[in-house]
Swiss-Prot record:
Keyword check for Protein biosynthesis: no
GO MF annotations in UniProt: ATP binding; damaged DNA binding; single-stranded DNA binding
UniProt binding sites for ATP: 115-122
Biased composition (Basic and acidic residues): 51-60
Residue segments, region Disordered: 1-80
Annotated Pfam families: SMC_N
Name of this protein: Structural maintenance of chromosomes protein 6
InterPro entries xref list: P-loop_NTPase, RecF/RecN/SMC_N, SMC_hinge_sf
Organism expressing this protein natively: Xenopus laevis
Length: 1128
């Protein structure tokens, strides 16, 4: 067998024919999987053409491949002539009508074989085809090999020498630099081969070896591109049928052979598929038969073998028990190792909690110191404030006394000034008045004065009554306004509670179908988003929540207490890690764009509840929050233990009993706080009342809650209506009283208006008196004394005014100081309040941190105890293992590795014992049954293997053929494009224009050519051309095919038979040019023309044939209808 240039083996053509008949492996899988289709079935040629076909998917790629191929030829032509496959010489004896021709020694590049008709040119070409294994029908000179033997002779002999040099030589160590193919033809139609080395030694006489050589050299004698006879040219090239031209192209490029190969493969696949179907039915029958034979075979199994098997099973049983014990110990050891690895984690948690406790205690001390400092400041400011307040009160008293004294002196001054004026008037009147006033005038004045005083008294009484009425109505209006403000506040509270109850009622109605609506309108959407994210794998562990939805009450009366205890934790969610927390935060930001979001707690998920027995509180009559609840998930329980310490909080229904237990007596151990049935929070030294009066989240009877809320809504509606009526009534009373008050104020003003003229009249009447009997001098003395008193009083007024101003200044200063200290005390109180809240929060934080630390300390203790317990269990199991090993060694000293369980072995031992007992009773023809069973099993396995193999082969073949056919189409396109390029280029050398049209669908090829300039006339079909022009176009077509097909030599018979001198000259130049560019190929051109005009060059060799013998006009060829040759 030959090898390719890369060293891989090449299957001879005879082997390829065999492979067609074998369905199992008709193609080399590696070649099909890695390369495209090739021109022929020959592996050597496929390898060469594959280089040109790879990656040829676009027109630009084809152009690149053409230019690349041209550059390769130029490179090859410059490097020298071909080393392998070219024909060095041909020798003929008794062939056709020639006794002896040759030997003809051909040059490595261009060879012209010239001679007259009948000189033997075509005989040489025919001998080349036949001598290299071609069929007689290919030559078109006969249908049988025996027709080539010269008439009158018994045999004919053909000897062809091929070059075998260079690195691509075929078995150079065996054949040397040349291979001589010697073939002997006999008249009985047989032929024999001799393959000789360069030394003349016969190496082989097998045709397979010749086929391997041809494959290696890529020689295709049946390819019209390699060897084109006159008859082939007439049939295909000169034919006017476009289908014939297309067939010629397909045959020349070996695409036809590939297409036939593909069709044959698909037919083979179809037949194989039918065989598989038939084999499947046959396989089922064989399987059933095999099962039946196997059952009979098992039923008569040798007792000795069964007993041996029984002993073997007993040995395995002994060591299986050992293996199972070892397997039981292994997880304990691994668990101990794992648990010991987790010890560090608990210690780290304890250290972390200790650090948090220290930090929290430092915060507590800092807040306590801050509060103490504020308290000391407040205590220090309090006496100062009291002193300043007393000082203000004293100064205000002094100022008020000085103001009273000042007003008294001022009134005294006004009285004295009025008296002085009256004395002055009196003296003047006395001086001017006469002593003749009558008694009747005096009495009349006195009577008028009395009447005026009576009227004044009535007006004074009326003024007093009016003042009393004004005071009463002012107080009534103030009371009404206070009542109205109180009603407004209660009305707003009722309205707020009314809206809250309506919202709760709506949530309760919705919770009848979706309980989660109790936790807010957004909660169902949030949980749906969490479920969706969990399905998409965005959480490591799905968050749990809301926590309130995961808890249930054992006693419904404790609902308000539990809700007051857990508060915001009822809405919280728990995450296993911070990555899940961030994802949940993102989801919440979408579902809760505004307002408060539920709290997220990060706590590692574990599948069991903490053991809190050591730190939990206990009371015989009252449960803790933990024991009062039924919780769905251990993660929720652990979260509430960590965040709220529910194991340390009691629920005591009664208020008084709660105070008694928590404050008047020592509370139970580990109890920090308690909650009453009404939701009040009770500490050892504090008591906080609950704002809520009813549970909203944990209530179980929704209908009762709805009924209760509807009743309260009706009550609130009634209360709202009552308050609105009262408000309207009060507003009306206020309006009426304010109207009456305005009337009394107007009446008071009118009284003052009425009094003023009366006072003036009485003053006037009192000044008109009788002339007194006293002396005017006395009145003047009184006036002088009165003036002195006025001066003294004025001095007292000034002193009182000055003193009052000084006291006012002192009072203002004292009030400013007092206001400042009040502001300081108020600011200290304001600062102290948030500090107290922070102190309470930090206190809770300290307690939580200590509780966490205690929790992890207890967990560490439990963890270490668990490890110790596991170690003790392992030690006990290891002792048991030692006992089992010693027992197993007594049964079977050497250990057996057993993969089965002891239980399955025990079952089989019992079954085998029963079978042995039954077989000891029954006997049969054991040998025949065993033989039948083995035969049936072999048949079944053989058919099963073949069916499986064929199924795999069909599947692989489908995949390969799909890829190969795609590559075949791409390769055909590449060859078509390259052929068009070369054809157009060759025509242009004669100034012709033309094109080749390929129709692969209809399998036609049309050539249109226009002699002369292409733009002067339309393209014409070759039928319109002259004989010389048509021959020239045909040569261009041939040369185009030469450019795309691979073969070491080309043979062309009478290519210029119909050409004129000009076209012959141009065609010759084109062939020589191509030969010069392809020096690695050999060209053998047969022509009857005289080649004396050829240029003298070392590349061209002319072989002239002798003229035929006189009288010889025809060659003794046999008719085509004679019997076909025997290929073997």
């Amino acid at each position: 067998m030959g090898k390719r240039k890369d060293g891989s083996p090449i299957a001879p053509s005879s082997q390829r024919k065999k492979q067609r008949q074998e369905v199992d492996d008709p193609y080399d899988e590696e070649d099909y999987g890695q390369a495209g289709p090739s021109v022929s079935n020959d592996y050597g040629q496929r390898k060469k053409q594959r280089k040109e076909a790879d990656n040829s998917h676009t027109d630009s790629d084809y152009e690149n491949s053409v230019s690349c191929a041209s550059s390769q030829r130029v490179s090859a032509s410059q490097s020298g002539t071909g080393d392998v496959g070219i024909i060095e010489s041909i020798f003929l004896r008794n062939f056709m009508c020639h006794s002896m021709l040759g030997p003809f020694r051909f040059g490595p590049n261009v060879n012209f074989v010239i001679g007259n008709n009948g000189s033997g040119k075509s005989a040489v070409l025919t001998a080349l085809i036949v001598g290299l294994g071609g069929k007689a029908a290919i030559t078109n000179r006969g249908s049988s090999i025996k027709g080539f033997v010269k008439e009158g002779q018994t045999f004919a002999e053909i000897s062809i020498t091929l070059r075998n040099r260079g690195q691509d030589a075929y078995k150079p160590d065996v054949f040397g630099n040349s291979i001589t193919v010697q073939q002997r033809l006999t008249t009985d139609g047989s032929r024999t081969y001799k393959l000789k080395s360069a030394t003349g030694a016969v190496v082989s006489n097998k045709k397979e070896e010749l086929t391997a050589i041809l494959d290696h050299f890529n020689i295709q004698v049946d390819n019209p591109v390699s060897v084109l006879t006159q008859e082939m040219s007439k049939h295909f090239l000169q034919s006017k049928n476009e289908s014939d031209k297309y067939k010629f192209f397909m045959k020349a490029t070996q695409l036809e052979q590939m297409k036939e190969d593909y069709s044959y493969i698909m037919e083979t696949k179809s037949r194989t598929h039918d065989q598989v179907e038939n084999g499947g039915e046959r396989l089922r029958d064989l399987r059933q038969e095999c099962i039946q034979k196997e059952e009979r075979f098992k039923s008569i199994a040798s007792l000795g073998e069964m007993k041996e098997k029984l002993e073997d099973l007993k040995n395995k049983m002994a060591w299986a028990l050992v293996t199972e014990s070892e397997k039981q110990i292994k997880p304990f050891i691994e668990q101990i190792s794992t648990e010991e690895g987790r010890t560090v984690k608990y210690e780290q948690k304890i250290e972390e909690c200790q650090g948090k406790v220290i930090n929290a205690e430092e915060k507590f001390r800092a807040k306590q110191e801050e509060l103490d400092k504020i308290t000391q400041e407040a205590v220090a400011l309090k006496p100062q404030g009291i002193g300043l307040k007393e000082d203000v009160q004293k100064k205000r008293k002094s100022y008020n006394e000085s103001e009273v004294l000042y007003n008294r002196h001022r009134m005294e001054l006004k009285r004295l000034e009025r008296d002085a004026e009256q004395l002055h008037k009196r003296i003047e009147e006395l001086k001017k008045s006469a002593d003749n006033d009558s008694e009747s005038e005096k009495m009349a004045r006195q009577k008028e004065i009395n009447q005026i005083r009576e009227r004044m008294k009535a007006l004074h009484d009326k003024d007093i009554t009016t003042n009393q009425q004004i005071h009463q109505f002012q107080q009534a209006i103030e009371k009404y306004k206070e009542e109205r403000a109180r009603i407004g506040n209660e009305e707003r509270n009722i309205k707020q509670r009314l809206e809250q109850h309506k919202r709760q009622l709506k949530e309760l109605h919705e919770s009848k179908t979706d309980r989660l609506k109790r936790f807010g309108q957004n909660m169902p959407a949030l949980l749906a988003a969490i479920d969706e994210a969990d399905k998409l794998g965005r959480f490591r562990k799905k968050p749990v929540g809301p926590l309130g939805a995961c808890i249930h009450l054992k006693d419904q009366e404790l609902a308000l207490a539990v809700e007051s205890c857990l508060k915001g934790l009822m809405f919280a969610f728990c995450c296993d890690n911070h990555q899940d927390e961030r994802m949940l935060q993102n989801i919440m930001s979408r579902e809760y764009p505004r307002g408060r979001r539920p709290q997220i707690i990060v706590n590692e998920f574990i599948d069991h509840v903490y053991d809190v027995r050591q730190r939990a509180t206990f009371h015989p009559d009252h449960p803790t929050v933990l024991t009062a609840l039924e919780i769905d998930h251990p993660v929720v329980t652990n979260c509430l233990i960590d965040m709220r310490g529910i194991e340390t909080i009691l629920i005591i229904k009664g208020k008084d009993e709660a105070r008694e237990i928590m404050q008047k007596r020592a509370p139970p151990r580990n109890c920090r706080e308690a909650f009453t049935g009404e939701g009040d929070q009770v500490y050892t030294n504090r008591y906080y009342s609950s704002d809520s009066r009813r549970a909203t989240l944990l209530s179980r009877d929704v209908e009762a809650e709805i009924s209760h809320l509807e009743k309260e809504l009706r009550n609130f509606g009634s209360q709202m209506a009552t308050f609105q009526q009262r408000a309207q009534s009060v507003d009306k009373d206020i309006k009426e009283n304010e109207g009456i008050l305005r009337q009394y104020h107007n009446s008071k003003k009118q009284i003052q208006i009425d009094l003023r003229p009366l006072l003036e009249r009485i003053s006037e009447l009192e000044n008109v008196e009788e002339q007194p009997s006293i002396d005017i001098a006395t009145l003047e003395g009184e006036a002088e004394e009165n003036l002195n008193k006025i001066e003294l009083v004025k001095q007292e007024v000034e002193l009182a005014k000055e003193k009052m101003g000084n006291l006012k200044s002192f009072l203002t200063t004292a009030e400013i100081n007092y206001e400042e200290i009040k502001k300081k005390i108020s600011s200290v109180a304001e600062v102290a309040e948030p500090v107290k809240e922070d102190l309470h929060r930090v206190d809770q934080e300290v307690e939580n941190c200590k509780r966490h630390r205690k929790h992890y300390e207890e967990k560490l203790k439990e963890h270490l105890d668990r490890i110790q317990k596991r170690k003790e269990e392992v030690a006990a199991k290891e002792q048991e293992l030692e006992v089992k090993i010693s027992q197993a060694k007594c049964i079977c000293p050497e250990r057996i590795e057993v993969s089965r369980t002891a239980r399955s072995l025990d079952t089989e031992i019992n079954r085998l014992r029963e079978k042995i007992n039954s077989e000891e009773v029954l006997h049969g023809n054991r040998e025949e049954i065993i033989k039948q069973y083995h035969e049936a099993k072999e048949r079944y396995q053989d058919v099963e293997g073949k069916v499986k193999h064929l199924k795999r082969f069909i599947k692989l073949l489908d995949e390969i053929m799909a890829q190969r056919y795609k590559s075949y189409q791409q390769f055909r396109r590449c060859l078509t494009f390259r052929c068009k390029i070369y054809f157009d280029s060759l025509l242009s050398q004669r100034a012709y224009s033309g094109k080749i049209n390929f129709d692969h669908k209809n399998e036609t090829l049309s050539i249109t050519v226009q002699p002369g300039e292409g733009n002067k006339a339309a393209l014409s079909d070759m039928k319109c051309l002259s004989g010389g022009e048509r021959s020239f176009s045909t040569v261009c077509f041939i040369l185009s095919l030469w450019s795309i097909a691979e073969s070491p030599f080309r043979c062309l018979d009478e290519f210029d038979v119909y050409m004129d001198m000009v076209n012959r000259r141009i065609s010759m130049d084109m062939m020589l040019s191509m030969a010069d560019s392809q020096r690695f190929r050999q060209f053998i051109l047969l022509t009857p023309q005289n080649m004396s005009s050829l240029p003298s060059t070392s590349l061209v060799r002319i072989l002239r044939m002798k003229d035929p013998e006189r009288g010889q006009t025809t060659l003794p060829f046999q008719p085509l209808n004679q019997e076909a040759e025997d290929e073997e």
